[in-house]
């Protein structure tokens, strides 16, 4: 699609977004939101089922939990932050970018990601016990020029969403802000320990508008600080207070293990996050990545079954919590399984190696030496594209954790090398740690999956009738 059409569509959407933000009367806001839905359907109805737009209208009409959630965001977040997030993550990435990505996928015969996760640095101001990224070492950095190259070339193929990890990405906060300013049509999201967030930084974030945060937290003060260091919990709470004060979008990033799973999903813990102003919480299943990684932290089948149900309880319209919970391992139902290998996202480590996933440290391509498209065309990514989904039970999505033989086969077939700079881990060693887990999880996962499919079928029948 030509740039004139893109510009006209973007201006039309921006006009309505501004009007929605200015509306104070709830009924007037509803009318404008429904008008925006109709315009998006007109522009992008060929990319989505009509049902998707109908559900959006129903959500607005029902005035339920998620519509109230949206209204709270519009009323409390900084206007520039809201406007930029809607235009960058919504219009550019979710709608317009999808058409561009589909065209690029057909042209280049490879997966084109919706989001690219990259590590500006391996450096960190903390020394957390068992952090997977520590395996890379602490002296690696992507230059600003390379980060700009990633974003610039990503935009050309429709990627407008960039996630930043590390190390601690805010060690490079000046370069991150520079990227945000240069690419105002992209949304950036940093996974951070939160300790480098201060007033001056928040003021700059509000100005750019296109940077949001996930703050890492492992539980309450005692548990969190036992892994991250004394005083870190209080510093994270202070960072949340600042972000809320400035109206900046933020949530949390939580790694759940056998030891903390009950705590980090408890009402008490979630109520704390909500009271601090968190809008969402990412839950990540512990992964035994690295030669020294312990399998003792892997959740039991009973614990993971609990997690599947608990996340759905938290999100539930009735009796849930006013926070959006996402479970990276257990929400495959909504995204057709594994999203790695460029299907929806990929990872670039601080050495420039382009990996299928933040947890899969194997590659045969490096962004320092190649352009983005050849990196996405690497053999390992092509194997991912051929084999996804790795399991039709989307509670068993991963080629490492739940289907370990799949990763062994792909790495061997493509000759991809370990990207661990300090202690390279063979794929056989990595996947051996997952064999027993996968075997014991399968029966519970299969029963849960059957229950979920039947529940979804029943809900669909009720909606039709």
Regions found by a protein language model. Name each.
Residues 116, 342-344:
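Short loop/turn microsegments at loop-to-beta-strand junctions
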Residues 92-113, 322-328, 332, 366-382:
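Short, charged low-complexity linear segments at domain edges
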Residues 1-8, 12-24, 28-36, 40-51, ...:
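Flexible mid-to-C-terminal extensions adjoining Fe-S/redox cofactors in radical SAM and related proteins
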Residues 144-164, 170-285:
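Radical SAM/AdoMet-radical enzyme domain recognition
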Residues 124, 128-131, 338, 352, ...:
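Short cysteine clusters
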Residues 33-200, 465:
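Conserved alpha-helical substructure of the radical SAM core
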Residues 1-54, 58, 225-341, 350-351, ...:
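Radical SAM enzyme [4Fe-4S]-AdoMet core and its adjacent flexible, acidic
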């Amino acid at each position: 699609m030509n740039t004139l059409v893109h510009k006209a569509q973007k201006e039309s959407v921006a006009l309505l977004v501004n009007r929605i933000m200015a509306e104070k009367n709830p009924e007037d806001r509803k009318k404008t939101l429904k008008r925006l839905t109709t315009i998006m359907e007109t522009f992008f109805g060929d990319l989505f089922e009509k049902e998707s737009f109908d559900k959006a209208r129903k959500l607005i009409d029902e005035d339920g939990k998620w519509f109230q959630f949206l209204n709270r965001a519009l009323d409390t977040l900084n206007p520039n932050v809201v406007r930029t997030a809607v235009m960058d993550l919504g219009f550019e990435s979710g709608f317009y970018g999808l058409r561009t990505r589909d065209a690029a996928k057909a042209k280049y015969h490879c997966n084109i990601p919706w989001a690219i996760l990259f590590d500006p640095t391996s450096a960190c101001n903390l020394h957390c016990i068992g952090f997977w990224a520590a395996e890379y070492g602490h002296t690696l950095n992507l230059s600003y020029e390379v980060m700009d190259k990633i974003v610039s070339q990503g935009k050309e193929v429709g990627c407008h969403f960039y996630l930043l990890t590390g190390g601690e990405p805010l060690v490079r906060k000046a370069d991150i802000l520079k990227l945000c300013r240069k690419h105002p049509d992209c949304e950036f999201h940093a996974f951070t320990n939160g300790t480098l967030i201060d007033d001056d930084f928040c003021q700059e974030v509000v100005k750019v508008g296109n940077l949001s945060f996930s703050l890492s937290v492992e539980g309450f003060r005692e548990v969190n600080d036992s892994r991250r260091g004394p005083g870190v919990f209080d510093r994270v709470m202070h960072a949340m207070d600042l972000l809320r004060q400035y109206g900046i979008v933020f949530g949390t990033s939580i790694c759940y293990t056998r030891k903390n799973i009950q705590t980090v999903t408890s009402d008490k813990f979630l109520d704390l996050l909500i009271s601090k102003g968190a809008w969402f919480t990412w839950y990540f299943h512990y992964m035994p990545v690295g030669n020294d990684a312990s399998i003792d932290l892997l959740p039991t089948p009973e614990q993971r079954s609990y997690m599947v149900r608990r996340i759905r309880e938290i999100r539930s319209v009735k009796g849930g919590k006013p926070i959006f919970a996402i479970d990276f391992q257990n929400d495959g139902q909504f995204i057709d399984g594994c999203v790695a290998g460029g299907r929806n996202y990929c990872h670039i480590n601080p050495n420039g190696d382009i990996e299928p996933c933040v947890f899969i440290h194997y590659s045969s391509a490096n962004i320092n030496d190649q352009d983005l498209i050849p990196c996405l065309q690497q053999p390992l990514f092509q194997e991912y594209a051929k084999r996804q989904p790795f399991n039709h039970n989307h509670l068993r999505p991963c080629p490492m954790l739940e289907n370990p033989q799949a990763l062994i086969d792909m790495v061997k077939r493509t000759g991809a090398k370990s990207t661990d700079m300090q202690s390279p881990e063979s794929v056989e060693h990595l996947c051996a740690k997952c064999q027993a887990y996968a075997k014991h999880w399968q029966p519970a996962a299969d029963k849960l999956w059957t229950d979920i499919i039947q529940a979804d079928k029943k809900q669909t029948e009720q909606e039709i009738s």
